[in-house]
UniProtKB/Swiss-Prot annotation:
Its EC number is 2.1.1.166. The keyword Transferase applies. It comes from Methanothermobacter thermautotrophicus (strain ATCC 29096 / DSM 1053 / JCM 10044 / NBRC 100330 / Delta H). InterPro entries: RNA_methyltr_RlmE (IPR050082), RNA_MeTrfase_FtsJ_dom (IPR002877), rRNA-MeTfrase_E (IPR015507), rRNA_MeTrfase_gammaproteobac (IPR004512), SAM-dependent_MTases_sf (IPR029063). It catalyses: uridine(2552) in 23S rRNA + S-adenosyl-L-methionine = 2'-O-methyluridine(2552) in 23S rRNA + S-adenosyl-L-homocysteine + H(+). Coiled coil: none annotated. The gene is rlmE. GO terms for cellular component: cytoplasm. SUPFAM superfamilies: S-adenosyl-L-methionine-dependent methyltransferases. This is Ribosomal RNA large subunit methyltransferase E.
Amino acid sequence: MGKRWQAERKRDHYYRSAKKENYRSRASYKLLQLNNKYKLIKKGDRVLDLGAAPGGWSQVALDKVGEEGLVVAVDLQRIKGFPAENFRAIRGDFTDPEVKDKIIRELGGRADVVISDAAPSLSGIRDIDHLRSVDLVENVLDIAYRVLDRKGNILIKAFQGPELDRVIKELRKDFWKLKTTKPASSRKASAEMYIVGRDFKGKEKWERIIH
């Protein structure tokens, strides 16, 4: 990263707040803001966090679920653990069938909430990055539909564009409440937005839009 990016990050309010309040990343505030608004995670929930490194969202989720709940975090990178017995970290590719099976074992079957702040490797070319983002969203949905309990919730990062609109159109059929939003802590220049799905109807499989 360049010196200009580093300087801008240090001036960023949420970056400084994360350091002060001991959050692992500024992204923690996105989940805090969205959960405060939509009440996605509650005490006792089983939460699956996909693309979780460095653990900013898992950190917030652990606080919300309390000792009665469970957070399972998955990423290709190592996720440093938390001093909590109800946290499980899995290092691996969540599209891998063996990793999916391990996720289900750690969850004990089902999840109440599936969250993902994952982003694809970016090329700088908007159309390509949009397609990569939608592919990642669909990979998240592949496992979310497999593990999400009826009445469960999802929160997934995505980049705006026409292919995402097609995905959202299908999601509206499978959740009683579905919308897209952008929290205050998202950078203004970012094309990111978040899919908020509440009250899952219980469909067993996601049918991919992009093949």
